[in-house]
Amino acid sequence: GSEQRLWRVLSGHSTLQVSAFMDENPLGFGLAQRARSFDAYQDAEARYEKRPSAWIAPQDGWGKGTVTLVEIPVQNEFNDNIVSYWQPADTLKAGERYDFNYMLSFAPEPPDSAPIARVVETMSGQSVNNATARTFVIDYDLDVFGSDDPVAQIKASAGSIGHSYLLRMPEQGRMRLAFEYIPDGAKLADLSAVLNGAGGALSETWIARWTRE
């Protein structure tokens, strides 16, 4: 409802993870897949690169509530382990009728036209400069930025953010943001990053959950 677009990265955590995103009258939510090359999965039978994204677009105001994301740990690829749903702020009472009108779409991309840069790829690994830190690399579509020089806003719910840089990669058509996350003893942290311009956000708000494994 706030017209802020969030891109929450999914991860294979070893423990159950539940995330809740508060909103009022959400414009849409779902599970989207952007890695569309065979090389991303190398599975000639399942052909994961051809799997559709699922998107729910509410048709009426749903009021206040949360989009809840559940990530269930699994031992193999055959178990479906990602769940996303809307939970109203007010408790639903037994015997009452509630109407939630929506459009459910299955397509390569969600059927919207948000005029901001989308996250193309997320990568992470141990920092080469700090053995206790982890490096995150986020690539965005470059075309949306034009001549604007965005400023990265990076946050962590626990721990701290170390060195970061923003780099244009015109040959790849990407804008790359890289930063170090330092846990500082934290066992869990929600990380976020957005690229801002003079008029506000120029990109999706990237969100990831880090857990100490």
What are these regions (language model features)?
Residues 1-99, 105-107:
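A contiguous, surface-exposed recognition patch within enzymatic or periplasmic domains that forms
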Residues 98-150, 174:
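C-terminal structural cap/anchor segments
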Residues 177-184:
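Short, hydrophobic beta-strand segments
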